[in-house]
Amino acid sequence: MKPSTEWWRYLAPLAVIAIIALIPVPAGLESHTWLYFAVFTGVIVGLILEPVPGAVVAMVGISIIAILSPWLLFSPEQLAQPGFKFTAKSLSWAVSGFSNSVIWLIFAAFMFGTGYEKNGLGRRIALILVKKMGHRTLFLGYAVMFSELILAPVTPSNSARGAGIIYPIIRNLPPLYQLQPNDSSSRSIGSYIMWIGIVADCVTSAIFLTAMAPNLLLIGLMKSASHATLSWGDWFLGMLPLSILLVLLVPRLAYVLYPPVLKSGDQVPRWAETELQAMGPLCSREKRMLGLMVGALVLWIFGGDYIDAAMVGYSVVALMLLLRIISWDDIVSNKAAWNVFFWLASLITLATGLNNTGFISWFGKLLAGSLSGYSPTMVMVALIVVFYLLRYFFASATAYTSALAPMMIAAALAMPEIPLPVFCLMVGAAIGLGSILTPYATGPSPIYYGSGYLPTADYWRLGAIFGLIFLVLLVITGLLWMPVVLL
């Protein structure tokens, strides 16, 4: 896109900062806190509009705040303290996000995904499932779901998982039956399989902490605001009943609501077998990779009392290097991993500043006054519903989480009766599950939408139906099960 036609994307964040900064400081806030919030909001607008990559937007915001820290980051009382050096303190704050364990956990998970991709293990697993279950269209839907489920814990980019591994496989399936995109025959099998592909990506993104980068961003925001956190095992156990239900329900539900014309056939299994033969037998690197992944999952689920999840990931990456599953060049050249590493660390830094300047506590008290008189359960459900429906207005899960999660956490902190771990897990699940609502909500959405097998009207209709079902089930399990295992 030409810069001359996109100038407004650059000016909009600056305009938002200026407008908020010119508004009189609300009662109960210090001027530096309000100015910090102005820059923070400008960063969020920049993440939504993306005049430059999101990581650059966040780094520019941090640079502005750090350089102008005497007016944006620190109070007059802090500056007046003997020996207080704002230059050193602002630098310490600016890089604080990079020491957060969440950052290293997601970076390690990206390296796991690199191992899967480089050795072809992820593709092999998906092809094996398609071969074994592809004789019937319904079972083929389950094969797609199970493939996503197996890959999700160690693939923190749902775009890499859905658009990079699963979609390239399933897009080859309709042509086996002489079916073409953007054709009346696409409903025969293509529409059903493509819909299962995007739904499976959204569902598995909610099941595991490491299945989607915004999940880890949420935990970082939660920790910076309250010093509480959710471990990998907490997330997994809290989501377990809903996960089992959705994994078993979704392919059957889609089969009923969006039935394929073609119910069975042998072309898909035969194609998968041919592809597997071309790949050859399971090699030693794939076996080592599989063993390390199983070990990591076991430690993530059961080892929380003995070793931090990030340390598990860090150690497994070291073993992957020693065993030559991946190379050092693979780490250095992984642009996607470094991109997420920088923007996630930067956003956690910005969220920490929002809490340190006192904005979160002020906003929480403001909400507490307006929410008084309502039951905590009613407030929690209302917040989740609002958060979920606002997904319609965001085309980026990162921007969505960055913009709304701090406010949701502040609202929960405003009412001590709301169990924060339960609430944050419900918010986290809503990020992934709500991605089904629109054809632009998350990275793989436009890929599947643009496949030619999902007409616009069908996508919006099915998105609303599945989205509503997901929301109802999330609220029910959030109120009945999550408190049992998290409190």
UniProtKB/Swiss-Prot annotation:
Membrane topology: Multi-pass membrane protein
Protein name: L-tartrate/succinate antiporter
Domain of life: Bacteria
Transmembrane domains' residue ranges: 10-30, 33-53, 54-74, 93-113, 137-157, 189-209, 230-250, 292-312, 313-333, 340-360, 370-390, 393-413, 418-438, 465-485
Catalytic reaction annotation: (2R,3R)-tartrate(out) + succinate(in) = (2R,3R)-tartrate(in) + succinate(out)
Sequence similarity: Belongs to the SLC13A/DASS transporter (TC 2.A.47) family. DIT1 subfamily.
UniProt entry keywords in alphabetical sequence: Antiport, Cell inner membrane, Cell membrane, Membrane, Transmembrane, Transmembrane helix, Transport
Chain's gene name: ttdT
One GO cellular component term: plasma membrane
Cysteine pairings via disulfide bonds: none
Free-text function comment from the UniProt entry: Catalyzes the uptake of tartrate in exchange for intracellular succinate. Essential for anaerobic L-tartrate fermentation.
Keyword field contains Cytoplasm: no
Cross-referenced Pfam families: Na_sulph_symp
Subcellular location: Cell inner membrane
